[in-house]
Structure formats: C-alpha cells, structure tokens
Amino acid sequence: MAVDIEEFRKEVYNVVASIPSGRVLSYGQIAWLVGCPRHARLVGKVLHGVSKAEYLPCHRVVNGNGRTAPCWEEQRGLLEAEGITFRANGCVDMRKWQWKLEG
C-alpha cells in the first residue's frame, strides 16, 4: 500500500499531540491508529524530523517493549517528570502506562 507521506505525517502528529501526560504509546500502536499498521518505522522517521519549534510530546512514544530512544537521554527524565516509572530493565511498563484509548 502506497502511503501519502504528508497525510501520514499529519495523522501521526495528531495522535502524538493527543497522548496525555503520564501515558505512552509505541511506534507500532501509532501506526495502527493512523491506519498503517506495518509502518512503525515510518512513524519513527516522522517523529525524528520534528523540530523543537513544533511542540509535540514525542517523549511519550517508546518502542513496543517500552524502551526509550537510545540517542535521546532526556526522554527518560521527561517521562519521570510526568510520573511514569521504569522497570528494573529500564523499560516503561506498557501494561501500566500505555494510553488506553476508549472505544
């Protein structure tokens, strides 16, 4: 399936902007929510291109195991400031902190 990258970017931004403080989603969950469940890596690429001028709470996006981005040391501190705790292995407990969408 061909992806309209600009439309995909807008939809990813909308989902990420909606993640409430103290909750997280994975790249794969975001891809699924925007209707492209096989494009988790593209979600990551889109978020990597977000400028600081475009405030998006990208720190609330982790991988499917709850691991934070290896090249973004501040991410953990931002999540902790919102009350999110980490397991001994350094991952977010997705069962506890994942944003549960109603519906």
Identify the meaning behind each predicted range:
Residues 1-103:
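Nucleic acid-binding interface residues in structured DNA/RNA-binding domains
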